[in-house]
């Protein structure tokens, strides 16, 4: 069942785009954090992903020595792999705590990738986690949640909360994402101004 003449009727049609969702509520984020707390590497990857808005490919290139001695409020300058533009990885308080929780959990050399896999290269060195591996991890973390989630969900979650919770303008988020226009950022996040206005009806 599910296939007819060698095709899967549930598979997206050729040329169609699959929308990847941000994690839109804080309860789900807290639930994932609780689930990952016993897995320091994965916990750090999640916290770092939702707090910086960087592409996962750039996070996976970070090495232990790049961030070991950074304090909260300090930054690491990176060159984006896709755009070749200079950007920064900010170490906020949540990231700093997750980072040191991870670094204290095992012996890691400065030349090790921060998010290393079990796979090794020809010289016997650990490779970084593959993007496809992280995508599977994200799908596991978000299992049972409505929506479609992958590595981009971490990056999108950062932008979603910056706009909806903190009221940061699309122009500022656009610059962080290195998008060519705020309109692209709005479509990327799937946010309309009405969605922002609706939350103002919430009573505290």
Language-model regions, residue ranges each:
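Conserved catalytic core of the tyrosine transesterase superfamily
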Residues: 1-204
């Amino acid at each position: 069942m599910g296939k007819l003449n060698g095709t899967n009727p549930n598979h997206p049609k050729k040329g169609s785009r699959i929308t990847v969702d941000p994690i839109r509520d804080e309860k789900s984020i807290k639930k994932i954090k609780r689930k990952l707390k016993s897995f320091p590497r994965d916990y750090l990857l999640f916290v770092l992903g939702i707090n910086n808005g960087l592409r996962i490919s750039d996070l996976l290139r970070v090495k232990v020595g790049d961030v070991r001695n950074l304090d909260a409020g300090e930054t690491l300058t990176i060159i984006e792999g896709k755009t070749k533009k200079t950007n920064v990885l900010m170490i906020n308080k949540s990231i700093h705590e997750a980072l040191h929780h991870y670094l204290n959990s095992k012996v890691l050399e400065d030349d090790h990738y921060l998010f290393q896999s079990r796979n090794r290269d020809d010289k016997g060195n650990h490779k970084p986690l593959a993007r496809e591996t992280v995508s599977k991890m994200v799908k596991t973390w978000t299992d049972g949640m409505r929506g479609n989630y992958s590595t981009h969900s971490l990056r999108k979650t950062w932008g979603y909360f910056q706009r909806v919770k903190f009221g940061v303008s699309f122009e500022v988020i656009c610059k962080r994402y290195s998008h060519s226009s705020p309109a692209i950022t709005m479509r990327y996040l799937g946010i309309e101004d009405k969605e922002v206005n609706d939350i103002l009806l919430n009573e505290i």
